[in-house]
Amino acid sequence: MKFIIKLFPEITIKSQSVRLRFIKILTGNIRNVLKHYDETLAVVRHWDNIEVRAKDENQRLAIRDALTRIPGIHHILEVEDVPFTDMHDIFEKALVQYRDQLEGKTFCVRVKRRGKHDFSSIDVERYVGGGLNQHIESARVKLTNPDVTVHLEVEDDRLLLIKGRYEGIGGFPIGTQEDVLSLISGGFDSGVSSYMLMRRGCRVHYCFFNLGGAAHEIGVRQVAHYLWNRFGSSHRVRFVAINFEPVVGEILEKIDDGQMGVILKRMMVRAASKVAERYGVQALVTGEALGQVSSQTLTNLRLIDNVSDTLILRPLISYDKEHIINLARQIGTEDFARTMPEYCGVISKSPTVKAVKSKIEAEEEKFDFSILDKVVEEANNVDIREIAQQTEQEVVEVETVNGFGPNDVILDIRSIDEQEDKPLKVEGIDVVSLPFYKLSTKFGDLDQSKTWLLWCERGVMSRLQALYLREQGFNNVKVYRP
């Protein structure tokens, strides 16, 4: 099988040296992602495209799907590469490839040509289009908005029969820009802002301020791992978790109610800046949008920025909530965000929307900054690839089984889309579907006399959710790994 990778247009207008660097990085990223599917595949770069050739036909769909999620790719063409002799040979090969697709449909033919030939692209379009129209009685030519567009590419003595075109996510290849540290809470905003910086070519590390215990951190780990695995797995990144409960406690005890929100955000920026400096990261990323909450007015944002020299990027600053939620839905983080607890908004009953710098600084004089230094020093830094392994170590009390007993039921916790695409059927045992994001509210409604074997494709989510359910007092859960 063969795929032709077309570059994001902004890459093609770069200078020759920059364009070549971007293409080299994108080629390396593609190799890093696809080697998990087929170690024998070949990735070959050209000036205006990248070729991916693989032998394992069983991995075709997985490879195609992975390519559509790698930043820097505009679209992917799945092609059949065959030799040809003349225009009639091109027509005959196109007829075999497209006959079934064109039955009862309107169509047109579009050709791209490179090399020296005694015909033009338009000549091929007319010849092939006329031939298809004659040999497929139920099809008819329609040059504007046809049901099917027959795409052909001619290069020297090779014909590329395009079997399908699939849109990529665009943007710049990860690694072409410098690293950033995303302040991730697991909600709609931080997930989308992290994705936007990945799409713009940054390697995104994650910094999480834990205000809600182990269950909250587990949820945010899921979001960070999902974003990395789906869009950024070509690079290693860090997940840094900071226990911020002592800081919140100090704020609640000593800070005036109206100033709490701004001061909490200032403490987060201070802490994140220290983490960024430690790892040589150039900028912080937040999901703040102008006017969305009290701490996100221009006055308050300026005061928050003042505590650090580190650049703070806010890709969502002009977005409304509906737009952000739509983006979260597109990238697959909506379901995570809907069930994620939000702690930042509850610590102040009457927050100020226009904080005064002198008042903020006066309130901060009451704060014991050694607490902030201590929580940063004790921050837990994990390679995001080790989240699954670390979870397995944490869930020592959750049994992993590869078989089942008479009282067991398999609980498929994949998302609804994954379940519909690839239903789980296991002979000799009932399988119940309950997406992971509904476990916190719906697991208690299940028959608690049964033992529930949590299952997902890779086992990461099932381990994380097993830990969460154990913490909630459910002891009738195991992890199923056949």
Swiss-Prot record:
Pfam families: ThiI, ThiI_fer, THUMP. One of its GO terms (molecular function) is ATP binding. The active site is at residue 456. Residues 404-482 form the Rhodanese domain. It is an enzyme of class 2 (transferase). Pathway: Cofactor biosynthesis; thiamine diphosphate biosynthesis. One of its GO terms (cellular component) is cytosol. SUPFAM superfamilies: Adenine nucleotide alpha hydrolases-like (SSF52402), Rhodanese/Cell cycle control phosphatase (SSF52821), THUMP domain-like (SSF143437). Keywords: ATP-binding, Cytoplasm, Disulfide bond, Nucleotide-binding, Redox-active center, RNA-binding, Thiamine biosynthesis, Transferase, tRNA-binding. Its main location: cytoplasm. Disulfide bonds join 344-456. Its EC number is 2.8.1.4. ATP binds at residues 183-184, 265, 287, 296. One of its GO terms (biological process) is thiamine biosynthetic process. It is found in: Cytoplasm. NCBIfam families: ThiI_C_thiazole, tRNA uracil 4-sulfurtransferase ThiI. PANTHER family: TRNA SULFURTRANSFERASE (PTHR43209:SF1). Belongs to the ThiI family. Catalyzes the ATP-dependent transfer of a sulfur to tRNA to produce 4-thiouridine in position 8 of tRNAs, which functions as a near-UV photosensor. Also catalyzes the transfer of sulfur to the sulfur carrier protein ThiS, forming ThiS-thiocarboxylate. This is a step in the synthesis of thiazole, in the thiamine biosynthesis pathway. The sulfur is donated as persulfide by IscS. This is tRNA sulfurtransferase. It comes from Escherichia coli O127:H6 (strain E2348/69 / EPEC). The gene is thiI.
